[in-house]
């Protein structure tokens, strides 16, 4: 599990009681986000920069940036077409069964990270609809 993922998700989840409207939709201050990323790139020991900020929008932006910069996307280039095809299946039961099987087929590192992040999204969407609407989750992943 990448430390940046567990750290950012943990900070976001710890702030769910506050007004976190548009956690993954609203852009954070780009300059601050870049400063935090630079510190983290120097050493994950500098991850305290995120914890000190306690700003969910910065954490969400750092997390989105991390996923965008992966050399092989979380849902892998190889399996991506199958995920897209599965998303178009009308029958809920069939669609979920196929998507679960595709997630299981992910490489181990991707599987663990995807499982953790999807659980995080479930926590957020289940906590308060203003934080992340369930119908919008597919946009972010």
Regions found by a protein language model. Give the residues of each.
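Alpha-helical catalytic/interaction cores of small GTPase-regulatory modules
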Residues: 1-141
């Amino acid at each position: 599990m990448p430390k940046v993922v567990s750290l950012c998700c943990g900070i976001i989840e710890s702030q769910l009681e506050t007004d976190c409207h548009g956690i993954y939709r609203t852009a954070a201050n780009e300059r601050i986000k870049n400063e935090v990323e630079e510190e983290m790139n120097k050493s994950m020991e500098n991850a305290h920069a995120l914890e000190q900020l306690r700003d969910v929008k910065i954490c969400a932006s750092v997390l989105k940036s991390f996923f965008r910069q992966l050399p092989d996307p979380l849902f892998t280039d190889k399996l991506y077409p199958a995920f897209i095809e599965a998303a178009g299946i009308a029958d809920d039961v069939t669609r979920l069964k196929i998507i679960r099987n595709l997630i299981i087929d992910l490489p181990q590192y991707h599987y663990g990270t995807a499982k953790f992040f999807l659980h995080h999204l479930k926590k957020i969407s289940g906590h308060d609809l203003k934080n992340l609407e369930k119908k919008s989750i597919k946009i972010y992943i």
